[in-house]
C-alpha cells in the first residue's frame, strides 16, 4: 500500500514538473515572438537618410519547356523566340535612400546574354527585397510570420541552439498563396533575425529564398544577401531561374570605368567567380554573336524578318517603357499594342480590349506634366471608349494642377427624346430597338485644383458635352436633332475633417447655360459625396461611400440626366477598378432616368476570409471581399445588391444578388482578367 502511494506521489510530481516546463516553454515562445515583433522599434532608421546602397544582382535562366503561349507573357518575348535555352544577366546598381520608404535606383552597369541586352522576368526582383519585420514581405503581398498582426495565420516550432540562438520553424495553418513556410535563426535576447529560408508560391512563381540579414554596417532590418530559386509554370511552359543579390557592395571606382568593357567591368565588381556553367553561357553567347556578325557580312538578313521579330513582335506583345530627355526627366509607359492577355468580357459590352499609355515629364522637382491615354474597344457595341487627361502640376506640395481632359464616355440613354422621335418617325420605318434611345457622349473638361491645406481642396473649371444619337440615321428620318450640346461652369470643394487619413466630404455644383459657347441645353446640378477607407492593416480594410445628387434646374425634355459620382463604368478594369463603389447588376439606363439619387456602398476586403479555407482551391485565393450596395432613384425604393468576390492569379470574380423594391431581381457574376497584371 505504501509503495503504491509512493508511486502515485512520484507520478504527480513528474506530471506537475512536466506541466511547469511546458508552461515555461510556452512563455519563452511567446516572449521570443514578442521580441521579434518589437525588434524594428529598437533600430535607428535615421541611418537610411541619404544612404547609398550598392547592389550586385545575378540572374540565371533555364527555359525547360516553351511554346507559343510564352510569347505574349510580359518580358518573356525575347527568350520565347530565341534559339538559346540558357541565359545569364548581371546588374550593378546603387539605391539612393531618402527615408525608409522613399528611394530611387540607378543602374551603373549591366550585361546580359538575352537578345538585345533586354531584361526578363523582372517580377523576380520583388522577391529580392524582403521585409520580414513588416506586415507583408514583398510589397503588398505575402503575410510575414514575424509581424504581430499575422500571428493567427502561422504555427511555430522552437529549438534552442548554442550561443544565444534559437531556430524557429514556421508553417501556415491553411495552405494559401499569401502565406509562406520556412525557418530562421534568431538571437533569443534581442529577437534579431540573422539568417533563414522561406518558400512559397505567388503569381505563378514557386520560389525558395535563402537570405542573410545585414550586419551593423547597413541595418539589421534589411538583407545583406539573397539567393532565390524560382520556377514559372504556365500552360506547358516551364522556366527556371536562379537569382542572387548582394547588398552593401563597394562603391564603383569611376576613374577606371572608361578603359573597361562592360564584361570586364562586371568581372571587377562581382563578389565571387562565375561557375563553369555560367561561364559556358557567356562563351556560347559571344561565339554566336561573332558568328552572326560574320554571316551578316556575307548574307544580308531579311529586313522584313528582322522588323517582324525584333521590332513589331516585341512592341505588339510587350509593355514599352522608356526614359527620354537629357537627364532622363521624361518617362513613357505603353501597354502592349496587341496582346490577348488584355482582353476582357462584360455582359452588356461583350468582348473588349484595353489599352493604356502614360507619360510623365519632370520640369523640376515641383513642376511636371502628366498625360494618360486610357482606351478600350467594345466589339459588341463597335465603340471605342477613351479618356485623355493632360495635367500640368505647378505645385507638387499642394497638389496644384491644371487639367484638360478629353473623352467620349459612356453611351447615355434618353427615353424622352426617343419617345419624341418615334412620334415623328414615319410609320413602318425600321429601327434598332436596342440602340434607339442611346447617345454617344463626347466631353471636354478644363479644371484647376489646389489643396489649400490638409483639410480643404478647391476645384473650379468648365465641362462641355456633345451627345450624338447612336442611331443617327433614324433621328434624321424623323427630322429631329441628332446631337445636343451643353457647356457648364463647375465648382467643387473637398473637406477632410481629420486630414488626409480620414473621411473626405465632397460638394460639387454644375450649371449649364443655354447660349454659352453655342450650348443648347440648360441645367443645374448639385452632388454630395463622402468616402472613407478604414485600414485595419496592410491587406485588410473597409471602404465606405455614400452620396446623393439632384437637379435643381431641368430645362425641357432634351436634357440628359448625367451625374459625376453616379455613372456606369464603360471599360471594367478588374479587381482594382471601382468595384467597391459601383452597382454591378444595375442596368445602364437607370443611371440616366432619375432627377435624383441616393446611394451607399460598403466593401470589406481581407485575405483568408472564406474560400481560402477550402482545401485544394483555397490556396489560390489572394484576397476576398464582401459587398453591400443600396440605391434610391425614381421607381427604385430601394435597389440593393449584396455580393462576395475573390481574386486569384488568373481572374477576379464577384457573385452578386440584387433586390428591387424588396423583391428578388436576379443573380449575376462579374469577371475581370488579372493574369500577369503585376508583371
Outline where the language-model segments fall.
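Transmembrane beta-strand segments that form the barrel wall of outer-membrane beta-barrel proteins
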Residues: 194-200, 228, 333-345, 356, ...
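Structured extracytoplasmic
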Residues: 23-165, 174-179, 237, 241-345, ...
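Repeated loop/turn-to-beta-strand initiation elements of outer-membrane beta-barrel proteins
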Residues: 363-369, 397-402, 454-460, 467-470, ...
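Residues that define the transmembrane beta-barrel architecture of outer-membrane proteins
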Residues: 349-353, 382-386, 440-444, 481-489, ...
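Residues on the lipid-exposed face of transmembrane beta-strands in outer-membrane beta-barrel proteins
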Residues: 353-359, 388-392, 444-450, 462, ...
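Outer-membrane beta-barrel transmembrane strands
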Residues: 347-349, 359, 431-464, 498, ...
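Gly/Pro-enriched, hydrophobic low-complexity segments
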Residues: 157-158, 163-261
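C-terminal outer-membrane beta-barrel translocator/porin domains of Gram-negative envelope proteins
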Residues: 401-418, 428-434, 500, 506-610
Amino acid at each position: 500500500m505504501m509503495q503504491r502511494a509512493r508511486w502515485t506521489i512520484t507520478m504527480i510530481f513528474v506530471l506537475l514538473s512536466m506541466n511547469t516546463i511546458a508552461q515555461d516553454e510556452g512563455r519563452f515562445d511567446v516572449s521570443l515572438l514578442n521580441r521579434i515583433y518589437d525588434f524594428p522599434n529598437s533600430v535607428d532608421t535615421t541611418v537610411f537618410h541619404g544612404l547609398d546602397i550598392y547592389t550586385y544582382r545575378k540572374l540565371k535562366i533555364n527555359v525547360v519547356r516553351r511554346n507559343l503561349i510564352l510569347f505574349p507573357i510580359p518580358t518573356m518575348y525575347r527568350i520565347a523566340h530565341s534559339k538559346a535555352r540558357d541565359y545569364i544577366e548581371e546588374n550593378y546598381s546603387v539605391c539612393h535612400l531618402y527615408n525608409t520608404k522613399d528611394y530611387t535606383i540607378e543602374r551603373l552597369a549591366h550585361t546580359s546574354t538575352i537578345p538585345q541586352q533586354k531584361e526578363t522576368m523582372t517580377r523576380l526582383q520583388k522577391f529580392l527585397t524582403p521585409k520580414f519585420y513588416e506586415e507583408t514581405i514583398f510589397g503588398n503581398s505575402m503575410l510575414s510570420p514575424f509581424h504581430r498582426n499575422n500571428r493567427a495565420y502561422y504555427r511555430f516550432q522552437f529549438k534552442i541552439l548554442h550561443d544565444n540562438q534559437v531556430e524557429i520553424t514556421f508553417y501556415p495553418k491553411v495552405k494559401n498563396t499569401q502565406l509562406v513556410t520556412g525557418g530562421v535563426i534568431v538571437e533569443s535576447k534581442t529577437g534579431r533575425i540573422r539568417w533563414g529560408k522561406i518558400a512559397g508560391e505567388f503569381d505563378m512563381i514557386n520560389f525558395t529564398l535563402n537570405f542573410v540579414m545585414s550586419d551593423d554596417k547597413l541595418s539589421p532590418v534589411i538583407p545583406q544577401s539573397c539567393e532565390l530559386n524560382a520556377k514559372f509554370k504556365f500552360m506547358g511552359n516551364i522556366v527556371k531561374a536562379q537569382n542572387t543579390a548582394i547588398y552593401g557592395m563597394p562603391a564603383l571606382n569611376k576613374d577606371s570605368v572608361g578603359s573597361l568593357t562592360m564584361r570586364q567591368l562586371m568581372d571587377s565588381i562581382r563578389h565571387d567567380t562565375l561557375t563553369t556553367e555560367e561561364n559556358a553561357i557567356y562563351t556560347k553567347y559571344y561565339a554566336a554573336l561573332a558568328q552572326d556578325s560574320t554571316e551578316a557580312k556575307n548574307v544580308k538578313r531579311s529586313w522584313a524578318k528582322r522588323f517582324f521579330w525584333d521590332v513589331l513582335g516585341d512592341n505588339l506583345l510587350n509593355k514599352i517603357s522608356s526614359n527620354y530627355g537629357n537627364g532622363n526627366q521624361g518617362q513613357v509607359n505603353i501597354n502592349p499594342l496587341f496582346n490577348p492577355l488584355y482582353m476582357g468580357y462584360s455582359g452588356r459590352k461583350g468582348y473588349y480590349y484595353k489599352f493604356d499609355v502614360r507619360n510623365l515629364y519632370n520640369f523640376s522637382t515641383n513642376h511636371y506634366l502628366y498625360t494618360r491615354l486610357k482606351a478600350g474597344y467594345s466589339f459588341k457595341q463597335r465603340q471605342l471608349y477613351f479618356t485623355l487627361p493632360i495635367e500640368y502640376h505647378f505645385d507638387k506640395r499642394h497638389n496644384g494642377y491644371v487639367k484638360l481632359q478629353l473623352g467620349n464616355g459612356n453611351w447615355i440613354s434618353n427615353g424622352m427624346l426617343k419617345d419624341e422621335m418615334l412620334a415623328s418617325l414615319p410609320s413602318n420605318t425600321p429601327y434598332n430597338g436596342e440602340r434607339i434611345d442611346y447617345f454617344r457622349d463626347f466631353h471636354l473638361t478644363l479644371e484647376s485644383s489646389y489643396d489649400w491645406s490638409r483639410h480643404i481642396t478647391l476645384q473650379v473649371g468648365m465641362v462641355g458635352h456633345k451627345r450624338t444619337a447612336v442611331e443617327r440615321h433614324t433621328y434624321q428620318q424623323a427630322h429631329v436633332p441628332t446631337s445636343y450640346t451643353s457647356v457648364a461652369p463647375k465648382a467643387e470643394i473637398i473637406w477632410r475633417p481629420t486630414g488626409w487619413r480620414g473621411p473626405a466630404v465632397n460638394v460639387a455644383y454644375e450649371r449649364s447655360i443655354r447660349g454659352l459657347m453655342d450650348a443648347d441645353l440648360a441645367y443645374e446640378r448639385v452632388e454630395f459625396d463622402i468616402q472613407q477607407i478604414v485600414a485595419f492593416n496592410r491587406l485588410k480594410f473597409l471602404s465606405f461611400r455614400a452620396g446623393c445628387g439632384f437637379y435643381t434646374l431641368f430645362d425641357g425634355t432634351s436634357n440628359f440626366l448625367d451625374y459625376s459620382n453616379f455613372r456606369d463604368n464603360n471599360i471594367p478594369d478588374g479587381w482594382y477598378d471601382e468595384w467597391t463603389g459601383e452597382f454591378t447588376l444595375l442596368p445602364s439606363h437607370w443611371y440616366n432616368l432619375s432627377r435624383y439619387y441616393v446611394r451607399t456602398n460598403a466593401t470589406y476586403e481581407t485575405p483568408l476570409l472564406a474560400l481560402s479555407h477550402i482545401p485544394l482551391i483555397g490556396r489560390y485565393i489572394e484576397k476576398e471581399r464582401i459587398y453591400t450596395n443600396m440605391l434610391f432613384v425614381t421607381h427604385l425604393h430601394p435597389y440593393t445588391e449584396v455580393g462576395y468576390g475573390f481574386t486569384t492569379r488568373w481572374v477576379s470574380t464577384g457573385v452578386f444578388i440584387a433586390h428591387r423594391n424588396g423583391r428578388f431581381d436576379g443573380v449575376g457574376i462579374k469577371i475581370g482578367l488579372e493574369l500577369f497584371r503585376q508583371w
